């Protein structure tokens, strides 16, 4: 319903249900939440793969407004919206998944040049090939021979049934004539099955370099055209062409990597400084504990060096243990944070390593 509503809004406007006198001419802004940000960047993958089983993209529920595209492209501060980075992530993800599929199918065809490998690495039967073709826009095998074989099989069954009925009625001559006719049809069926089997054995398969569909090599021209006009093939060809032009423009290199290694080092945490100051004031000059911790000595018994009594009536030992545990935990946390910050700063200062990651 959302996709249908978005299409109606795109063609008729959001105020399509209002009377002409009540309609207000309002121009959409490219930053509106109901505007498709992928369309602003140049290509919406939902539009290419509608009703196609591509990572469950489905139809686009956003508006595709050409005026918003002009607004976005002419905006000097468009980079701050970060639409392009998300668009590149989605498009490159589609291409990467498709490249993996092409590589996987090629490896399986190398294992058996006749192409008998399915999605799980096992043999591809004729039925599974047809399923792949239906789903991915590949080439369907010749169904004309199969239909002839099916027709012959039905005629044979019909003749055998009539011959049996005539034999029960005592019409032996007529029954034998039908049996002879059925035997001739059986021979024709066997010949057709042999021809079909030889065709399947001689047919080699290949992988489409654009969409990854399994194809029969040297098949009929009309089937090749049907594959090239398939929705998946056209979709992947389009996004590959768009991304090739995008790479040539140099804008992809300006985006850099999206992980935290490419970000500047984070500011020093005030929490860390507070912990350091608190740890420095933990002991006074004489080595005694700070007054905030009860004024007792460092030993767990609680008596200080000047001969004072037990800390808080003998309860100092348990409190000291509790505070020591908390302090050790804080130290481990601070130490881990310091290590992470140092690792990020070292990486940020290493230009060669960052260049290698961006090229990768």
Swiss-Prot record:
GO molecular function: mRNA binding
A Gene Ontology cellular-component term: nucleus
GO biological process, one term: RNA splicing
Disulphide-bonded residues: none
Function: May play a role in RNA splicing.
Assigned protein family: Belongs to the Luc7 family.
Protein name in the entry: Luc7-like protein
Lineage of origin: Eukaryota, Amoebozoa, Evosea, Eumycetozoa, Dictyostelia
Name of the gene this protein is made from: crop
């Amino acid at each position: 319903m959302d996709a249908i509503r978005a299409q109606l809004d795109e063609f008729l406007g959001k105020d399509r249900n209002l009377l002409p006198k009540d309609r207000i001419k309002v121009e959409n802004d490219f930053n509106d939440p109901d505007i498709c940000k992928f369309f602003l960047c140049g290509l919406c993958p939902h539009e290419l793969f509608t009703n196609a089983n591509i990572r469950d993209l489905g139809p686009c529920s956003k508006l595709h407004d050409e005026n918003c595209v002009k607004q976005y492209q002419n905006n000097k501060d468009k980079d701050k919206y970060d639409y392009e980075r998300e668009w590149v992530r989605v498009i490159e993800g589609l291409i990467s998944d498709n490249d993996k599929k092409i590589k996987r199918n090629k490896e399986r065809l190398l294992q058996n040049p006749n192409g008998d490998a399915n999605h799980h690495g096992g043999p591809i039967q004729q039925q599974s090939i047809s399923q792949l073709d239906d789903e991915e826009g590949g080439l369907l095998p010749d169904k004309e021979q199969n239909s002839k074989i099916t027709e012959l099989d039905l005629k044979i069954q019909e003749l055998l049934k009539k011959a049996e009925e005539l034999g029960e009625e005592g019409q032996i001559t007529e029954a034998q004539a039908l049996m002879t006719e059925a035997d001739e049809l059986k021979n024709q069926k066997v010949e057709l099955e042999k021809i079909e089997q030889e065709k399947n054995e001689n047919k080699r398969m290949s992988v489409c370099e654009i969409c990854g569909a399994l194809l029969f090599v040297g098949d009929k021209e009309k089937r090749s055209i049907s594959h090239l006009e398939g929705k998946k093939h056209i979709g992947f060809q389009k996004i590959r062409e768009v991304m090739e032009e995008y790479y040539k423009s140099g804008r992809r290199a300006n985006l850099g990597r999206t992980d935290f290694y490419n970000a500047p080092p984070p500011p020093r945490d005030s929490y860390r400084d507070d912990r350091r100051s608190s740890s420095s004031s933990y002991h006074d000059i004489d080595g005694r504990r700070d007054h905030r911790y009860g004024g007792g000595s460092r030993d767990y018994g609680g008596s200080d060096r000047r001969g004072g009594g037990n800390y808080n009536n003998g309860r100092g030992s348990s409190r000291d243990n509790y505070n020591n545990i908390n302090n050790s935990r804080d130290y481990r946390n601070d130490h881990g944070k310091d290590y992470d910050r140092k690792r990020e700063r070292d990486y940020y200062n290493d230009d060669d390593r960052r260049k290698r990651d961006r090229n990768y």
